[in-house]
A protein has these predicted regions:
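Short, contiguous pre-domain boundary segments
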Residues: 12-30
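N-terminal pre-domain segments of enzymes
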Residues: 1-15
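Conserved small/polar residues in nucleotide/adenosyl-binding loops
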Residues: 148-155
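Cationic, low-complexity basic patches in intrinsically disordered or flexible, solvent-exposed regions
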Residues: 158
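Electrostatic cytochrome c docking/interface patches
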Residues: 31, 35-36
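Alpha-helical structural elements
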Residues: 2-5, 22, 153
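Glycine/serine-rich phosphate-binding loop and adjoining beta1-alpha1 elements at the start
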Residues: 40, 44, 48-56, 62-146
Length: 159
């Protein structure tokens, strides 16, 4: 856990989005991710609770609670807090092959399951995910992945 008292010290901060009437004028990014300092504060809010429901992805009575991809949310929040973006990206990429998409379109079920959200506002997990992947592309440690080394065992065909 990055900062044991972070959830008490910092308020939730969400990334802003460009207004729809402005969005339609161009094809630019309209989710403006948080600054590194704000991401660090939001990561500090992660309590690293004993049972991280945010990453559980459980289906109860036909409804999903937590991340269905089982993203290692407390782990990459801790890495964000310490400023280790490359390791945070590696942790994120372990369970999520397309964080560049999910950070934009995911309904953030992890935030609904966040323990911190039971007594206040949940951690801005989706915004942190967005920040991790954008930083990874900007700093050059994320990019196209080649899967040509994988082999389909039954057909002996290469992917």
């Amino acid at each position: 856990m990055g900062k044991p008292t972070g959830f008490m010290e910092y308020d939730r901060c969400e990334a802003r989005s460009v207004e729809p009437k402005e969005r339609i004028k161009n094809f630019d990014e309209f989710h403006i991710f948080l600054s590194k300092e704000k991401q660090r504060e939001q990561a500090a809010r992660c309590m690293d609770c004993g049972v991280p429901f945010c990453q559980s992805g459980m289906t109860v009575a036909g409804m999903t609670s937590g991340c269905p991809l089982h993203n290692l949310v407390p782990e990459w929040n801790d890495l964000l807090y310490t400023g280790n973006y490359q390791q945070a990206y590696n942790r994120l990429h372990k369970t999520n092959n397309f964080p560049e998409f999910t950070s934009r379109v995911c309904p953030a079920l992890c935030e609904k399951a966040c323990t911190c959200g039971h007594w206040g506002d949940p951690v801005s997990v989706r915004d942190n995910e967005h920040g991790i992947i954008e930083t990874a592309y900007k700093e050059g440690y994320a990019g196209p992945v080649s899967y040509t080394h994988l082999r389909a065992h039954e057909t002996d065909q290469y992917l």
